[in-house]
Every structure is written in C-alpha cells, then in structure tokens.
Amino acid sequence: MVFACLLALAAAGRASAYTQQELSLRMDDGVDLAATLYEPSTAPPPAGHPAIVLFHGLGGKRQDLDFLARAFAGSFPVLTLDARGHGQSGGLVSIDGPREMTDVKAVFNWLAARPEINRNRIGAWGISLGGGAVLRSLVEGVPWAAVETVETWTDLYSALAPQRLTKSGAVFQFLNSVPQARLDPSVLAIRDDALASTNLGAVRAWADARSSRSQLAKVTTPVFMFQGRRDFAFDIAQARAGYRLLKGPKRLYVGDFGHAPSTFPGPDIAQVTSLGLKWFTRYLIGTPASFAPVSLAPSPWRGKLRTYATLPATRRLTIQLGGTDSLTGAGRALRTSGPLTARVETFGSPQVQVTAQLSGGWSRVVAVLTAKPQRGAELVISEGGVNTTGLTGKHQLTIGLIDVATLIPRGSRLQLYLASSSLAQSSGNLLYLNLPMPPSARVRLGPARVVLPILRSPVSR
C-alpha cells in the first residue's frame, strides 16, 4: 500500500512540468555539497517563485526524498542536497554541528540569490538529522518562511540520554549509519562516553549545541511538526515540548511512522505529504487553508485522523506489581499483571516506580513494559532506564519510559521486565545494550508500580 502511494506521488510529480538540474555547491571551506534543483517550467511571478529545501536523515542521501521533491515540484522549486559527509558530498559529519549550520546558511543564501526565487518565501522540510538541522538553523536566524519537521528532536540530550542513561543501542546504530572515516573528530570525541553513559557533561554540551528547544519560545515562524506514534529514538515528547513553546502558527501530527520499531515512509505517507504541501502552499504562497491544531493517526492506518483543538486529554491507569528479586549480571525480574478489562491506548510517558537495594557498583536499571494479548505476539509498549552510578543502599527509583502511542488490546496482561539492559526482554530489543558491570554488582528489587497515561478515548483498533 505504501509503495502504491509513493508511485502515485511520483506520477503526480512527473505529470507536472518541471526541470531537474544536478548541482555542486561550494562551501566556504572548499567542500562541495551535491544537490538537485527541481524547478517548475512556468515563468516565475514578479516577486519570484517561493521555494523549498529538503534535508535528509543521518546516513541518508538526497535521493531518499525524491518522491517528496517530485510531489512538491509541481508547485515550488525544490532543492535537495546531500548533507556534509553524506552521499556525493565531501567533508565530515558532525551531526548538525556548527559546521553544518554554516552549510545550511550558505545553501539558503545560494537559493535566495537566484533571480527566479523569492528570498522571502523559502521553506524548509527536514527528517531526523535534517529536522534537527532545520530547527537549529531556524533558532540561529536562518529566515525560513515556513518549516516542517519529521521524526526529529528538539533536545538531543534528553532524547538520547533520558535520566542520564544513554539509549546505547540507538546511539550505536546512529553512529554506525555513517562510515567511521566520515565522522568528524567532534563526534569521535564523545562516541565512547555516549555509548557508556560516562562523562555526561561533555555529551550534554555536545548535544546542546545541536538542539533548538531552549530557543523555540522566540520562534514565530509557521512550524508543522510530524512525529511518529512509536519512535523509540525521538519520541512524541520531543515534538510535544517544542509544540508547546512555539509562538507562531503551529501544528502537530502524530503519525504511523518513525524510527525503529516503525519505518518511514509509513502507511499514512500520502496524508503526510498532502498536509505538508498544503502547509507550504498556505504559508509560502498565501493560499487560504485550515488545519487541525493536533492530529493523531490510528494504527493501523485506516485513512482517517482523529483531530483535537489541543493536545489530547489523558487519564492515568495505575497497576501494582508485587514481588521481590535479587539480580546479578544479566539477570532479570519479570512481573505480570492480571488481564486488562478494556482496550487502552497510551499517550505520554509511562512511569515505573520500584524500590532498589543497590550494591557493588550496579550502574543502571532498565525497564521494558510489554503487553501479552490473549492472541498474538508480545508487544513492547515502552521502555526506559535510569543511571544508578554511585548509588548504594536502598532507593525508590522512578523510571520514565519513552513517550509513544501504543494500543493495548482488552484482555492483555502487562509484563514488566527489570534488568540491566533491554535484551533481558528479547535478544532483538537492542535499545539499551548489555554493557559490562563489575562482577560484584547486585540489585534487589521490591514491588513495582506502573503508571500509564492513556487516551480518554482510544483512536486505534
């Protein structure tokens, strides 16, 4: 179904008359960025064409967004480019660092200087790494006229190291999506600490220089945030926090796509593309249009959104899970609830509260919350972890889990895994890796309480 949607979008782009030109843009340090410029064949209006720049994700290339460029090119000139260190571009990848921000400014200025382009009507669309670049460049003063971001971060540190424990598996995957020879020394300098949750002050400083949240309250530019329902790298909380801060026209779409365990494009790609084109048409051309402030796509996607005037209302479901377990090394505790009496859908960050007696250098507690339905496979609802380095003795731990929207069928039993890594739940669950701890490390876990924020009315079936 997704493939059919992409074919339809590409066909729509081919049916519209535009030209396509391959380019090489020279940066001020001598590095060349490979780019493609799509332009309508029609003559520009007196003030010039409004235009859009597309930014791809980490480890990607500009061709990943060909389907989107063609969908937009019937209405706008569209510039796609290989980010520094990616695809056919030169240079090294510093993951939206200062050098990449200089590149973004140069790309904007290059496009704005073209006689057929209206420099006051240039928009930006970015996914993941590209979304981070769009938001960071926006708060650094690049005068985008309208912005769209997809499955990205507003605060990179809180995304990758919530509660001072890095999502080591996600960090490993991201860093290995780019050949080591193409990583900038600034990334290599924090790589080992980012994997091991050590020297977190340096990791935070590095991440803060690539984040936008602290400055979003001054942004009045129209911003449309598209975030995935089940994205364990950059969760709904990243967009939710940014959405609340923005002062200009803003919209939030929580869709059926994302980083693992989801994919992009997802089954609602036609909806995402249609709304994206409508947003740019509204704020770059001025065509009147209305948008729901907040939209939530059901999973599986059935072609219809649930819309809200504000962020959806939720209530709390609290579940007590008794038991006591003593763990060493790769041991795990497993607690199971009774069956749920109704279908529920999470929306927000669940919490796990548990008493822990720590000794011998036990440095982390990871919680994986799953649902075991009456029929079908076990489903990971959410997961998270807390850094316990330096703690000894008895402590009441509160573990915040990832903010995702997950449908839990009626009759499901909740299963809570507590361990030192997410692999204790499944060998395929690589979000928190099983990193070494001292042989003397021990933890004794007491009863646990799970607090689930759930929608007052589920949107999925």
Question: Each predicted region: which residue ranges?
Answer:
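Short beta-strand/loop motif that positions the catalytic acidic residue
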Residues: V219, M225-Q227
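Gly/Ser-rich "nucleophile elbow"/oxyanion-hole loop immediately N-terminal to the catalytic nucleophile
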Residues: S41-G48, L92-E100, A106-S128
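Proline/glycine-enriched tight loop/beta-turn segments at coil->beta junctions
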Residues: V31-L33, S41-A51, K218-T220
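Accessory cap/linker subdomain of secreted extracellular hydrolases
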Residues: W125-I127, L135-K218, T287-F291
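Short substrate-entry loop that stabilizes the transition state in hydrolases
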Residues: P44-H49, L54-G90, F232-D235
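Short alpha-helix in the alpha/beta-hydrolase fold that links the catalytic acid
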Residues: T221, F232-R244
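Glycine/threonine-rich phosphate-binding loop and adjacent beta-strand/alpha-helix elements that clamp
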Residues: Y18-S24, D28, A34, V272, ...
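Catalytic histidine neighborhood in serine/cysteine hydrolases
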Residues: L246-P261
